[in-house]
């Protein structure tokens, strides 16, 4: 809303009198705010922590199993329980971030993970290692919730998709670093190699703790505390103009229930949205729009994980070994290639989100994942039914794994976090996003802990056929339930939701709504939704 009004007011001033040749020049693209980008990068450093753990465990679990003499079940539990433990962090993060602020919740996430990484690196045995993963999991849960919330709240509307995709970018960067760490420390003695792999994960947490000193607080959180003066100063730094900053502030004040005539640096804020009433509005008595938002957010998180991306990433060395790559060094190198592909395609996605839109990328991504999972299942089934190595089937397995992570990274990976963090109303955002993270981590933990048992029960090819079938259901859900949010302000989201398959009508209304530019009109530049 704010960004459109800035553009509309500028255009109005040009066309009120005569039409000059310059008026017909192509409209300039909005400037990218470098300070907002820097803030988003610092906040999203928390996402490296999860990515590193996913990547490093794919190789470290083999060393851990050999060193501590663990069974496949114990390794599955070790790999998957961090996701379950992160539920504690994500559940606490909503209330914590509303209490101490988004900025210091980012710091808390880094501190907790730092302690957990050190405990894992120093673990003398399985029980101590599990305790370290418990602590690290809480830190990951905090980071997964707060990074997208902070980024979406500090981002200008026209670059929100680009900036809010940063958490997934850093998850992928963390995965790549984890794979590289596996390869770098694989030459060490077994009892040292995995400890170095896990312990090095503490380094990003240190960088985060130092870098956060340069981050401002979220302007939307500041408004919710009644600190309008501080919020205005942050918006001035993260907007492309003073006028845009003022319009963004007006939108946030309206969403927070603060009367427009209140302009003091510190004002009182209505308290009805705090505590238990937030959960009442979100779960017990939601409006049709909030119910639709909740279904969409939880659904996209559910399908992001249930389609098996963690099985592909976490167990890629085993998949390549099953396909016929016998050399452990070659297996790790192939796994590093997976990390590079994920990172490259997530960077491509960041530049497409605000140009192409969420829905086209999401549906294309899911279609590619379905095809690659089906082909991977077919190739692994063929390999399973032959005693000798079949070169073309091995090549197809490697190619389909790379295709799968590429299609995931260009759509479903980043859009899940962008979409779920931008659609909730301001007063419900922290708790809403924490619910999405909880669903995401539960399903991720289930997939991680059951993959080895699943492929033993229905064959490894059958497991990927199952994921492909679930992918078809995901595509139908995305097509029918998720409106396009590109170009809409955070304060406009409720207009799009609540109509389910008729969301296009609401989107068309927002696009065609006329703005009154008449002289002396008190509501100049305002959009009326009645």
Residues covered by each model-derived region:
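Transmembrane-helix signature of 12-pass secondary carriers
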Residues: 2-236, 247, 260-530
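Short helix/loop segments within enzyme catalytic domains
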Residues: 239-242
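Short amphipathic alpha-helical segments embedded in low-complexity Lys/Glu-rich regions
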Residues: 248-255
């Amino acid at each position: 809303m704010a960004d459109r009004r800035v553009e509309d007011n500028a255009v109005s001033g040009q066309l009120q009198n005569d039409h000059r040749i310059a008026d017909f020049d192509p409209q300039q693209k909005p400037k990218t705010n470098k300070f907002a980008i820097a803030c988003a990068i610092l906040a999203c450093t928390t996402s490296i922590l999860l990515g590193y753990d996913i990547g490093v465990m794919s190789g470290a679990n083999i060393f851990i199993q050999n060193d501590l003499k663990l069974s496949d079940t114990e390794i599955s539990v070790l790999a998957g329980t961090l996701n379950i433990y992160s539920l504690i962090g994500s559940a606490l993060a909503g209330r914590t971030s509303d209490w101490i602020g988004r900025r210091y919740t980012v710091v808390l996430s880094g501190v907790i993970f730092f302690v957990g990484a050190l405990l894992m690196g120093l673990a003398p045995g399985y029980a101590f290692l599990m305790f370290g993963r418990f602590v690290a999991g809480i830190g990951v849960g905090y980071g997964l919730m707060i990074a997208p919330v902070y980024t979406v709240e500090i981002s200008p509307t026209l670059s929100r998709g680009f900036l809010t995709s940063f958490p997934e970018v850093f998850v992928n960067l963390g995965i790549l670093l984890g794979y590289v760490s596996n390869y770098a420390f694989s030459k060490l003695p077994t009892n040292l190699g995995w400890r170095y792999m896990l312990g090095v994960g503490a380094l990003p947490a240190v960088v985060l703790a130092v870098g956060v000193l340069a981050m401002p607080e979220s302007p939307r959180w500041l408004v919710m505390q009644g600190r309008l003066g501080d919020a205005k100063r942050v918006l001035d730094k993260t907007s492309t103009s003073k006028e845009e900053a003022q319009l963004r502030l007006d939108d946030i004040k309206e969403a927070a229930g603060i009367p427009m005539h209140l302009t003091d640096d510190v004002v009182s804020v209505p308290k009805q949205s705090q505590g238990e009433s937030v959960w009442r509005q979100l779960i017990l008595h939601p409006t049709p729009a909030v119910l639709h938002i909740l279904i969409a957010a939880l659904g996209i998180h559910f399908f992001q994980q249930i389609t098996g991306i963690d099985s592909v990433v976490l167990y890629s060395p085993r998949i390549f070994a099953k396909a016929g790559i016998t050399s452990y060094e070659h297996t790790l190198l192939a796994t590093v290639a997976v990390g590079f592909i994920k990172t490259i395609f997530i960077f491509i996605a960041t530049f497409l989100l605000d140009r192409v839109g969420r829905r086209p990328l999401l549906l294309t991504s899911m279609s590619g994942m379905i095809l690659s999972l089906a082909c991977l299942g077919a190739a692994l089934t063929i390999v399973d039914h032959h005693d000798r190595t079949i070169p073309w089937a091995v090549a197809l397995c490697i190619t389909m794994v790379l295709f799968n992570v590429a299609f995931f990274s260009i759509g479903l990976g980043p859009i899940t976090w962008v979409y779920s963090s931008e659609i909730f109303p301001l007063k419900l955002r922290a708790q809403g996003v924490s619910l999405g993270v909880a669903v995401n981590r539960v399903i991720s933990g289930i997939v991680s802990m059951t993959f080895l048992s699943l492929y033993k029960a229905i064959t490894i090819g059958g497991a990927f056929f199952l994921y492909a079938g679930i992918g078809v259901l995901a595509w139908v859900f995305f097509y029918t339930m998720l409106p396009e949010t590109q170009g809409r302000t955070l304060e406009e989201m409720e207009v799009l939701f609540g109509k389910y398959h008729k969301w296009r009508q609401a989107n068309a209304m927002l696009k065609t709504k006329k703005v009154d530019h008449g002289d002396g009109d008190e509501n100049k530049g305002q959009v009326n939704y009645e």
